[in-house]
């Protein structure tokens, strides 16, 4: 049986720090996150996020990762929580679709598992993510 409680809008706003437009809120248990090894086992394309502190940026990156066919996202502890309200909203739910987990600052394991490092940039010399040289890489 699902328990439900009611509260005055002002009380709910005080609990959450937000004025809830429809007066509904819920609390859920977070799923246990998989290990980095589990996430990367069959992945070919992995995004590693470091020091992304704005929730909207985290959500946008997850949404872009889904559009670009990224297999998994590894989030360093210096980043905003991908499950915070704004990140989830901006991600349009893709944070629940793309496998992700936290990774410590040491990313050497990725190289040991055959991943090559690439960075994304908006500049004249940048190549498309669909570039044949990048596509030929087994793990990126």
Model-identified regions with their sequence ranges:
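Post-transcriptional modification and biogenesis factors for structured RNAs
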Residues: 1-140
């Amino acid at each position: 049986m699902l328990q439900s409680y009611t509260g005055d809008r002002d009380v709910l706003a005080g609990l959450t720090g937000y004025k809830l437009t429809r007066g509904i809120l819920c609390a859920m248990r977070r799923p246990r996150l998989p290990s980095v090894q589990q996430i990367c086992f069959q992945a070919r394309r992995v995004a590693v996020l470091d020091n992304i502190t704005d929730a909207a940026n985290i959500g946008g990156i997850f949404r872009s990762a889904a559009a670009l066919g990224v297999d998994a996202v590894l989030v360093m502890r210096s980043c905003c929580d991908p499950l915070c309200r704004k990140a989830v909203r901006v991600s349009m739910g893709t944070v629940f679709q793309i496998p992700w987990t936290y990774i410590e600052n040491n990313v050497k394991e990725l190289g040991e598992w055959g991943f090559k490092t690439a960075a994304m940039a908006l500049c004249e010399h940048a190549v498309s993510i669909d570039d044949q040289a990048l596509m030929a890489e087994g793990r990126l």
